[in-house]
Amino acid sequence: MNLNATILGQALSFILFVWFCMKYIWPPIIFAIETRQKNIEESLISLKKAEEELIIIQKKMNQIIQDSKEKASFIINEANKKKSIILEDAKSIALEESKKIFLRNQLEIDLKVMQVRKNLHKEIVDLSILIAEKIIKDNIQKDQYKYSIKKLIVSLSKDKKLI
């Protein structure tokens, strides 16, 4: 094989082309590739950190939710206890008031019964006296009734004094 000028020219132009590519084209391409690799690595690292932070935040959030549930449960239990205490107090107060009202009404009833009895007794005494007076007027001459009437009047007057 003969080395002629064409092969030498092609070899020289190929060497110049390779040198030109190595000098001016490859460095920006390599730089862009390296920059993109760094960006991808940084993104992956930040993604891992974000996932770890997310896990930590979720744990904290779950803990806060659990604490809140416990506090809410405690508050509800305390409110229920206070409610039952207030209801018991109200029941006891209402029972005491009902007893007082019952006693007051019972006293009023007893007082009215006594007044009615007095009035009834007074009316009976008045009617007895009136009947006795009529009998006396009708039978004043009869001695037989005099003793009975005097006895009745004396007993009625004694009863009247007792009232």
Swiss-Prot record:
Pfam families from the entry?
Answer: ATP-synt_B
Q: Is Cell membrane one of the keywords?
A: yes
| Transmembrane annotation, as ranges | 13-33
**Coding gene?**
atpF
NCBIfam families from the UniProt entry: ATP_synt_b (TIGR01144), PRK05759.1-2 (NF004411)
Under which name does UniProt file this protein? Answer: ATP synthase subunit b
The terms describing its cellular component in GO are:
plasma membrane; proton-transporting ATP synthase complex
Question: Membrane topology type, per the record?
Answer: Single-pass membrane protein
Q: Where in the cell is it found?
A: Cell membrane
Q: Summarize subunit and interaction data from the UniProt record for this chain.
A: F-type ATPases have 2 components, F(1) - the catalytic core - and F(0) - the membrane proton channel. F(1) has five subunits: alpha(3), beta(3), gamma(1), delta(1), epsilon(1). F(0) has three main subunits: a(1), b(2) and c(10-14). The alpha and beta chains form an alternating ring which encloses part of the gamma chain. F(1) is attached to F(0) by a central stalk formed by the gamma and epsilon chains, while a peripheral stalk is formed by the delta and b chains.
What Gene3D superfamilies would the database entry show? 6.10.250.1580
